[in-house]
Design a protein with these regions (language model features):
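Per-blade loop-tip surfaces of WD-repeat and WD-like beta-propellers in eukaryotic adaptors/scaffolds
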Residues: 58-70, 102-131, 137-173
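Blade-loop segments of beta-propeller domains
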Residues: 65-94, 121-122, 128-129
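Conserved beta-strand element within WD40/beta-propeller blades
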Residues: 45-49, 94-98, 144-148
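Loop/turn segments within WD40 beta-propeller blades
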Residues: 37-41, 84-91, 135-141
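Loop/turn position at the start of each blade in beta-propeller repeats
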Residues: 30-32, 39, 79, 89, ...
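Acidic and/or Ser/Thr-rich intrinsically disordered tails and linkers
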Residues: 1-67
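Conserved long hydrophobic alpha-helices within structured protein cores
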Residues: 16, 54, 95-106
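Conserved beta-strand position repeated once per blade in WD40 beta-propeller domains
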Residues: 83, 133, 175-176
Length: 176
């Protein structure tokens, strides 16, 4: 008799409790390589399809429930959102990129959204075409990079919206 060991012997799961999400579907209507979903220890951000521009759904990670038909969204871009990234240093700091050519930083209230949010914490204008990708610096707190479809890479200081560096790329970037 031959016995085989499962390579999954230390993986455990638990069944969702009633009332928790049983499916989440994120759609990105943009031609981008960016993320439609990102998560921090406190929040889940999802690129939400709406008419008239990009919107972002924000959900508290410790308060799972079925999504109501109407709930508060981040509404600040005039075109589709192409990428979402939470800061690795501040759990409620979210960056969003858009086809409108902007990068916006959002400070989500600690108790989540209770009404639509339209005022960003910081706005970065510099790209001449849509912004495709974002990446927070992994070890420097207030630095973020953005790549646009015009083959340009910007490195920004989040605290004062200063351009730290601009690099013209020879080809389109697909990852930062």
């Amino acid at each position: 008799m031959v016995s085989t060991l499962s390579k999954y012997k230390n993986i455990f799961g638990e069944q969702n409790q009633k009332g928790q999400f049983d499916s989440v579907e994120a759609r990105n209507n943009s031609n981008s390589d960016g993320s439609s979903v990102d998560v921090s220890p406190d929040f889940l951000a999802i690129n939400w399809l709406t008419k008239g521009g990009g919107a972002i759904g924000i959900f508290e990670t410790n308060n799972f429930m079925r999504v109501k038909s109407s709930f508060p969204l981040i509404r600040g871009h005039s075109a589709a959102v192409t990428d979402l990234k939470f800061s690795p240093f501040v759990n409620n700091l979210l960056a969003s990129a858009s086809e409108d050519g902007t990068v916006k930083i959002w400070t989500i209230p600690e108790n989540g959204l209770k009404e639509d949010m339209t005022g960003e914490t910081q706005l970065f204008n510099g790209h001449t075409k849509k912004v495709s990708l974002l990446a927070f610096h992994p070890s420097v707190r207030d630095v973020i990079a953005s790549v646009g479809s015009a083959q340009d890479l910007f490195v920004w200081n989040i605290t004062n919206s200063e351009v730290l560096s601009k690099i013209n790329l020879n080809e389109q970037a697909y990852n930062i």
